[in-house]
Amino acid sequence: MNLSSLKPAEGAVKSRKRIGRGPGSGLGGTSTRGHKGAKSRSGYSKKIGFEGGQMPIQRRLPKFGFKNINRVEYKPINLSVLQTLSEANSLTKISVEDLIAAGLVSRNSLVKILANGTVTTALTVEAHAFSKTAEEAIVRAGGSVVKL
């Protein structure tokens, strides 16, 4: 046996349909396209979304809202999380890098600090955004806020 003698299994390869080659072929005449009409003619292609004259789905369904391409999404981190993180690692400065290292946020996400929970230690917190109450709570505890 060698590569030049290999053949596909019996019945595995079908011969292609040769249409429009005269009446003797069995596929002449209308060439499997039926009689007349746009679909029988060359160059025919129906419009995308065309449903045979029925009102298409994109016009039947009501239209709601849109996706704002300028939307900025922040990953929320609560003050209680910052407090537990600072206690566990004895940190006084918490940056986005610390949150990434702790597995709380992914590398490319923007971070917003929210005021759920309390902060008892003086922390310097770096983040992309802060809620007003979170900012006040951090400053009240003797810490500071750094917006990136």
Swiss-Prot record:
Pfam families for this protein: Ribosomal_L27A (PF00828)
Function of the molecule: Binds to the 23S rRNA.
Keyword Membrane: no
GO cellular component, as recorded: cytosolic large ribosomal subunit
Superkingdom of this protein's organism: Bacteria
Subunit: Part of the 50S ribosomal subunit.
Taxonomic placement: Bacteria, Pseudomonadati, Bacteroidota, Bacteroidia, Bacteroidales
Keywords per UniProt: Ribonucleoprotein, Ribosomal protein, RNA-binding, rRNA-binding
Entry keyword rRNA-binding: yes
Family affiliation: Belongs to the universal ribosomal protein uL15 family.
One of the protein's GO biological processes: translation
PROSITE patterns xrefs: RIBOSOMAL_L15
Listed transmembrane segments: none
Spans annotated as Disordered: 1-51
GO molecular function terms attached to this record: rRNA binding; structural constituent of ribosome
Biological source species: Porphyromonas gingivalis (strain ATCC BAA-308 / W83)
Record protein name field: Large ribosomal subunit protein uL15
Gly residues: bias regions: 21-31
S-S pairs: none
